[in-house]
Structure formats: C-alpha cells, structure tokens
C-alpha cells in the first residue's frame, strides 16, 4: 500500500553539491551526432513495423495466409515489448546508453537479414522470425528519446531533442507507409512478386548494417560534463537511490503518472490500430488504391512529425506541459471524429486532408507524453517512465487492433473508428485530472537558485551553459 510519503520525491540537490560542480555544465556539439544516430536506427526499425501492414493484401497473396496473420507481423512489435521492457530498462539502468544502442542496432540488423532469407511462399514463419527479432530491437529503442535528450542536452533543449528523437521513429513509419507499395506492386506473377519483395528486404538489410557499424564506432555513453543542473543533481545522487525495483514502486504510487500512463496508452494504442489497419480501411472504400493508402499513411505521419517538432519547441519555450498535452489530446479526439465520418464519402483528397489533421495531433502527442512523464517522475530514470508509457501503449495497441479489426469485419470501418473515438474521449478526460507537478523544472530552478545566491548578484539569473567542441 502506498502512503503519502511514498508518493513524494525530494528534488532538492544533495548537500555536497557545490557551486563549482554546478557551474561546470557544458553542451557538446557531439550531442547532435548522438541524436542523429539514435534517430537513424529508430527510423530503420520503425520502417519495418509497418512495411507488411500497408500492403496487407499483397503479403496475404504471396504467403497464402489470412489478413489476421499479416496483422500479427505488426502486432508482434507490440506483444514483444510488454514482457521485455522490464529487463531492458534494468539493463539501461545498469549498463547505460551505449550498450542499449549497440544491442538495438545489432538485433535490428540481424532481423533484416533473416527476412532476406524468407522470400518464398512457404516461409512465412521465417519472415515472422525476422520480424520478431526486429520487434526485440524495438524494445531497446522506443523509450529512449527522453533518455538521450536528458543525458546529452541542456534544460532549454530537452523537449526539442526528445521531439527530434521521436521524429526518427515517425519518419521511419512514414517511409514504411510510402516505400513498400512502390517497391512491391500488386502483380499476379509470383516470381516477379518475390523479386520485388527481395529487393525491399535487401535494401533494408543494407541500411541496417551501415547504421549498426556507425553505432559501433561513433555512439558514446554520455558527455564528460553534464549538460544541465538536473543531470548534475542526478550524478551527485547516492547510487542506492537508483534501485530499479524501488523506482518502479515509487512510480506506481505516483497518481498523476498513473493517469498519464493510462491516457498515453489509449492515445498511442489508437494510433497503432489505425496504422496497422489503414490498408484494410482504405481498400474497403477505395479498391485498388494500395499506393494511395501508403500515401495517406505518409500524410498521417508527416503531419505528426510537424506537430511533434512544433510541440517540442513550444514546451521548451513555455513549459506548459499539462495545458499543451490536454489541448493536443482533445484535438486528437476531434481529428479522429472527422476522419471517421469522412472516410466513406468517396473523395480521396478529403481522406488525405483529414488524415493529416489526425496525424498532426495524434502523432504529435508522442513527445508530449514522454516529456510530461519525465517532469512528473523526476528524479526517476527517464528510461523507466518512458518504458512504462510504451508498455501501456503496446497493451492497448494489441487490444485495439484486434477488436477494431473484428468490428471492421462485422460492422464496417465507421463502427471500428467510433470505437477508438470513445477511448480517445476517455483519455482526454483522464488527462484533465492530471496534477501538473513539474519536478524536473523545480530541480533546475532550485539548484540554479542555490548557485545564483553564491555567484550571481541578480535574482533569477541562471548559470551560463557553455557549448564546446566535440
């Protein structure tokens, strides 16, 4: 049982945190290289999540399996995440960013080469094995944007850096919507179809191999000097306070975080369901439009990329975490309603437009959830809070994909989309009840205030953060 004391995290700096250590915060130019590398292997992995689902009918024909079986090539990403996130988060706590990055890039690379060997109609199980390997790599990736941002970037950059980290994943999904319908056209000759699939798999494997080599030789654990006062406080924290199980227990007693955990899962789970079933929804109303289904998916994600970056910059400037998160959540609900009631009107241009509106807010919500969670749970590890958020998203994603798929089969796409609208409304209401306890901001202000009293004569003046070469 949780008492009131358990739900409180003291964010005051340790008594031995001297001004000299606080004033040594620095920003390294290499932080942008690290962020680019992370975004690159995240992109490669996310591309593979959706590469089957967006041409669902083509892979059904090639492997001679049901649409539900092809759906599982996407849902395996969600299923794998749930049991493996806890050991992976523990590994992140013990071994750090570099080990996790190496495992992510290497397992993802291995999965791509397994799929290269699966281009025969009788080898569906091999392509599932390769996809399973890639789904394991995803566990090392999905919760990392906020961790990379906090470890490498200053307090005025973390939200933007987190948004850029999420951007890599979103861009991978966007390419996954766009490229497979172009590389793998719906041809009748099975030999020709196998050749097209093989080309797609070989290109993916080559890119994954190059990224893996870059991670091996370039990716670093952390900067020598911390980039922010909050990171200084964490580095000065006694190691006993970094217990993973104790951290999980404290998070489970944090009521604002629990509300965010559920509402985040409802929103992102809805996005996973829409993305996985997009081909089926578009083809039902617009037969033969596989390529345009991919382009609609691209529109959905690109609009979300823009939304993510705008929201990240907005958070860095305003620090209005709850207000922004609630506004974007409500607009995601509105966007889903508009998409639901315009999908069957027979105008593809309208579907492109409504998908863009939906994507701008629904995908734009992703970095908001990460950063709001970090604020609510500081000084707990960013990887732990992000991992739990993503675990919630996977659970709801699997449930929503299966249930919405069955509803579409029996009652049509409108009923399936209304099903998601109901849960987005519930998530919006839950978000409104989250208490805005911005602990990381308090830590930066209080630590900075202590330093100001010793080295700055003017109230509110902050310590300079130096940017140095790589």
Curated annotation (Swiss-Prot):
Record keyword Phosphoprotein present: no
GO MF: choline transmembrane transporter activity; ethanolamine transmembrane transporter activity; heme binding; heme transmembrane transporter activity
Transmembrane stretches, start-end: 24-48, 67-94, 97-116, 124-152, 158-183, 189-218, 255-285, 290-318, 321-343, 347-376, 385-410, 413-435
Taxonomic superkingdom: Eukaryota
Organism: Danio rerio
Keyword Glycoprotein: no
Location within or outside the cell: Cell membrane; Mitochondrion membrane; Endoplasmic reticulum membrane
One of the protein's GO biological processes: transport across blood-brain barrier
Cellular component, GO, one term: mitochondrial membrane
Function (record text): Choline uniporter that specifically mediates choline uptake at the blood-brain-barrier. Responsible for the majority of choline uptake across the blood-brain-barrier from the circulation into the brain. Choline, a nutrient critical for brain development, is a precursor of phosphatidylcholine, as well as betaine. Also mediates transport of ethanolamine. Choline and ethanolamine transport is not coupled with proton transport and is exclusively driven by the choline gradient across the plasma membrane. Also acts as a heme b transporter.
Classification via InterPro entries: FLVCR1-2_SLC49-like, MFS, MFS_dom, MFS_trans_sf
Catalytic reactions on record: choline(out) = choline(in); ethanolamine(in) = ethanolamine(out); heme b(in) = heme b(out)
PROSITE patterns assigned: MFS
Taxonomic lineage of the native organism: Eukaryota, Metazoa, Chordata, Craniata, Vertebrata
Residues exposed to the Cytoplasmic side: 1-23, 95-96, 153-157, 219-254, 319-320, 377-384, 436-470
Entry's family note: Belongs to the major facilitator superfamily. Feline leukemia virus subgroup C receptor (TC 2.A.1.28.1) family.
Membrane topology: Multi-pass membrane protein
Protein name, entry field: Choline/ethanolamine transporter flvcr2a
Extracellular topological domain residue ranges: 49-66, 117-123, 184-188, 286-289, 344-346, 411-412
Positions of region (Disordered): 445-470
């Amino acid at each position: 049982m949780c008492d009131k004391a358990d739900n409180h995290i003291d964010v005051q700096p340790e008594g031995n945190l001297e001004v000299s250590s606080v004033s040594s915060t620095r920003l390294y130019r290499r932080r942008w290289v690290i962020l680019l590398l992370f975004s690159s292997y995240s992109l490669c992995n996310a591309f593979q999540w959706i590469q089957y689902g967006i041409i669902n009918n083509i892979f059904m024909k090639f492997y001679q399996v049901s649409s539900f079986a092809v759906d599982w090539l996407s849902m395996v990403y969600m299923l794998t995440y749930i049991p493996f996130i806890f050991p992976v988060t523990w590994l992140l706590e013990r071994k750090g960013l570099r080990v996790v990055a190496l495992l992510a890039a290497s397992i993802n690379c291995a999965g791509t080469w397994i799929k290269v060997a699966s281009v025969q109609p009788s080898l569906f199980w091999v392509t599932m094995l390769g996809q399973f390997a890639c789904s394991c790599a995803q566990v090392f990736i999905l919760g990392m944007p906020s961790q990379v941002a906090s470890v490498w970037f200053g307090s005025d950059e973390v939200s933007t850096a987190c948004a850029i980290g999420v951007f890599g994943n979103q861009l991978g999904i966007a390419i996954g919507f766009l490229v497979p319908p172009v590389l793998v056209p719906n041809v009748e000759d099975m030999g020709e179809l196998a050749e097209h699939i093989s080309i797609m798999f070989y290109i993916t494997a080559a890119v994954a191999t190059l990224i893996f080599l870059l991670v091996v030789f370039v990716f670093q654990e952390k900067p020598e000097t911390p980039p922010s006062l909050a990171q200084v406080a964490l580095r000065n924290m006694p190691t006993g306070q970094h217990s993973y199980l104790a951290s999980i227990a404290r998070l489970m007693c944090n009521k604002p975080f629990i509300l965010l955990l559920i509402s985040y899962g409802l929103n992102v789970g809805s996005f996973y369901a829409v993305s996985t079933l997009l081909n089926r929804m578009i083809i039902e109303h617009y037969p033969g439009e596989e390529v345009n289904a991919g382009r609609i998916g691209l529109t959905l994600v690109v609009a979300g990329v823009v939304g993510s970056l705008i929201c990240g910059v907005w958070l860095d400037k305003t620090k209005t975490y709850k207000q922004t998160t609630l506004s974007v959540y409500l607009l995601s609900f509105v966007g889903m309603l508009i998409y639901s009631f315009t999908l069957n009107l027979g105008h593809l241009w309208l579907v492109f437009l409504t998908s863009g509106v939906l994507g701008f807010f629904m995908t734009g919500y992703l970095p908001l959830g990460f950063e709001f969670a970090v604020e609510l749970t500081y000084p707990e590890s960013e990887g732990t809070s992000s991992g739990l958020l993503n675990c919630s998203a996977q659970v709801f994603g699997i449930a929503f994909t299966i249930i919405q798929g069955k509803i579409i089969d029996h009652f049509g796409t409108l009923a399936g989309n209304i099903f998601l609208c109901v849960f987005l409304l519930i998530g919006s209401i839950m978000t409104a009840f989250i208490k805005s306890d911005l602990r990381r901001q308090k830590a930066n202000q209080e630590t900075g205030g202590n330093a100001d009293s010793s080295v700055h004569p003017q109230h509110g003046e902050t310590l300079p953060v130096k940017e140095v070469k790589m």
